[in-house]
Amino acid sequence: MKDSFLFTSESVTEGHPDKMADQISDAVLDYIIERDQKAKVACETLVSNGFCMITGELKTSVYAPMQEIAREVVKKIGYTDALYGFDYRSAAVLNGVGEQSPDINQGVDREDGEIGAGDQGLMFGYACKETETLMPLPIHLAHQLTFALAQKRKDNTLPFLRPDGKSQVSVRYENNKPVSIDTIVISTQHSPEVSQKHLKEAVIEEIVYKVLSKEYLHDNIKFFVNPTGKFVIGGPQGDAGLTGRKIIVDTYGGSCPHGGGAFSGKDPSKVDRSAAYAARYVAKNLVASGVCDKATVQLAYAIGVIEPVSIYVNTHNTSKYSSAELEKCVKSVFKLTPKGIIESLDLLRPIYSLTSAYGHFGRELEEFTWEKTNKAEEIKAFFKR
């Protein structure tokens, strides 16, 4: 008897209010880190009806023009008219950023050149063989749909689309392997002139069938396109947006646990971000090496402490090696101190705006060093000793 179940993940477009906030926070981080690699940045953003507020804590010698940075991000996303729910020209931008607490900084910057963790916390990484990029299929498909919504809007293929939007994909699994798409939900902001019928047909034909792999498509997929019937009011006019509210979209779509820490606006001394990237790097290389088909990796840190307080590897019964053996391998092959992570993944670069929409993982861009599988051979060699 087949073990059959559905698993669902969602994604949001770059014009979703929470993603707007993430992108502004990461644009501020990129501006500062490009000019001051020793900077400590924790930038939070709120967007609401007609205004944006940037807050958080900094330790840097760099002046960051917050208004200009925020307006440029919003313009690039496509909020160029108040009718869309936000206008980069007329929106108020408020700056409430303060200085980083010296109590925190004394535990991070060490006289010996090492870096203590910027906070306590636990971070997870995950990899599996469901896609070529070793990501779970549901979140992979959901990101493909939201990215296509933005691209078809920007290239004027579907000129009635507006920036805000979401997708959700339910995938059927049999014996723990994905076999087909069961349900697709797409909610997209649109101009008031377009009919619901035309919108649904265009989205299915131009986005779903032209973007998703035919391997998982079939005639009986259930489609829900703007199921409420209308989505004209969107962006920050429809909902307020905050940095760090799309942590499952940013990671694995719910396929593995999440430690709770958000990424955007945080420099890599914050292990919420850098150690989550490292955990993905570890998990992906374990799977790529062939020692397992699936891996969940947990790292945990204490504020001001250099080494992780714990490392845990779960291969979900897909490896002949025990968790203890795999953890010993991870400690041997990977540098998992904050400094080791920053140096091995080259994280002191202005790369973070690229991460702030459509997922931090599974996108094999040159800048995303945590997606490389250059440790796979070392892992193989470890188990041949």
Curated annotation (Swiss-Prot):
Question: InterPro entries given for it?
Answer: ADOMET_SYNTHASE_CS (IPR022631), S-AdoMet_synt_C (IPR022630), S-AdoMet_synt_central (IPR022629), S-AdoMet_synt_N (IPR022628), S-AdoMet_synthetase (IPR002133), S-AdoMet_synthetase_sfam (IPR022636)
Broad class of where this protein is predominantly found: cytoplasm
Q: Where does L-methionine bind?
A: 57, 100, 239, 270
* Residue ranges of the region described as Flexible loop: 100-110
User: Where Mg(2+) is bound, by residue?
Assistant: 18
Q: Which residues bind K(+)?
A: 44
Name the CDD domains for this protein: S-AdoMet_synt (cd18079)
Localization per Swiss-Prot or TrEMBL: Cytoplasm
Query: Do you know which PROSITE patterns this protein is assigned to?
Result: ADOMET_SYNTHASE_1, ADOMET_SYNTHASE_2
User: What is its EC class?
Assistant: transferase
Cofactor dependency: Mg(2+); K(+)
Tell me a Gene Ontology molecular-function term this record carries: magnesium ion binding
Name a GO CC annotation attached to this entry: cytosol
Reaction it catalyzes: L-methionine + ATP + H2O = S-adenosyl-L-methionine + phosphate + diphosphate
- Which keywords fit this entry according to its UniProt record? ATP-binding, Cytoplasm, Magnesium, Metal-binding, Nucleotide-binding, One-carbon metabolism, Potassium, Transferase
| Protein's pathway | Amino-acid biosynthesis; S-adenosyl-L-methionine biosynthesis; S-adenosyl-L-methionine from L-methionine: step 1/1
Q: Where is the signal peptide?
A: none
Q: Give the co-factor note.
A: Binds 2 divalent ions per subunit. Binds 1 potassium ion per subunit.
One Pfam family it belongs to: S-AdoMet_synt_C
Q: Which GO terms describe its biological process?
A: one-carbon metabolic process; S-adenosylmethionine biosynthetic process
Q: What is its EC number?
A: 2.5.1.6
Q: How does it assemble?
A: Homotetramer; dimer of dimers.
This molecule's function is given as: Catalyzes the formation of S-adenosylmethionine (AdoMet) from methionine and ATP. The overall synthetic reaction is composed of two sequential steps, AdoMet formation and the subsequent tripolyphosphate hydrolysis which occurs prior to release of AdoMet from the enzyme.
PANTHER family of this UniProt entry? S-ADENOSYLMETHIONINE SYNTHETASE (PTHR11964)
Name of the molecule in the record? S-adenosylmethionine synthase
